[in-house]
């Protein structure tokens, strides 16, 4: 298995799909990485040479991915909570942040129903 950005990339998948295993790289970004490096998208990772994998490593290293990106997201949410702004309060209470209705629905964010005690 090839190791890029601290992640084991699956060998049996095509390059475009395999790169999406890295947090912070989706399909569009992986397509742009393949285009900029000149590696075909439909080639499997196991068929790539070590030089091509090194080229991919260098291309992925230019982006904020994995641990750094997770830390960045966590810090931005924490900053909102510390500010006490509306979005921060919604994060703190575990409710939807982007204006969705909560009278019905929003069960994923709110968690399972709590029975009313009489």
From Swiss-Prot:
| Cysteine disulfide partners in this protein | none
A GO MF annotation of the entry reads:
structural constituent of ribosome
Q: Specify whether tRNA-binding is a keyword of the entry.
A: yes
One Pfam family cited in the UniProt record for this chain: Ribosomal_S13
- Annotated function: Located at the top of the head of the 30S subunit, it contacts several helices of the 16S rRNA. In the 70S ribosome it contacts the 23S rRNA (bridge B1a) and protein L5 of the 50S subunit (bridge B1b), connecting the 2 subunits; these bridges are implicated in subunit movement. Contacts the tRNAs in the A and P-sites.
Record HAMAP family: Ribosomal_uS13 (MF_01315)
Q: Spell out the protein name for this chain.
A: Small ribosomal subunit protein uS13
The organism's lineage is: Bacteria, Pseudomonadati, Pseudomonadota, Gammaproteobacteria, Enterobacterales
Q: Which gene encodes it?
A: rpsM
């Amino acid at each position: 298995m090839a190791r890029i950005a601290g992640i084991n990339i699956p060998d049996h998948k095509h390059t475009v799909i395999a790169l999406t295993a890295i947090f912070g790289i989706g399909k569009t970004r992986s397509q742009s990485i393949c285009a900029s490096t000149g590696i075909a998208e439909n080639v499997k990772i196991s068929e790539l040479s070590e030089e091509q994998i090194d080229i991919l490593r260098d291309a992925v290293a230019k982006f904020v991915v994995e641990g750094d990106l997770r830390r960045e997201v966590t810090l931005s949410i924490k900053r909102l909570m510390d500010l006490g702004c509306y979005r921060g309060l919604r994060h703190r209470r575990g409710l939807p942040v982007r204006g969705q209705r909560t009278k019905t629905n929003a069960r994923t964010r709110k968690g399972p129903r709590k029975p009313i005690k009489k």
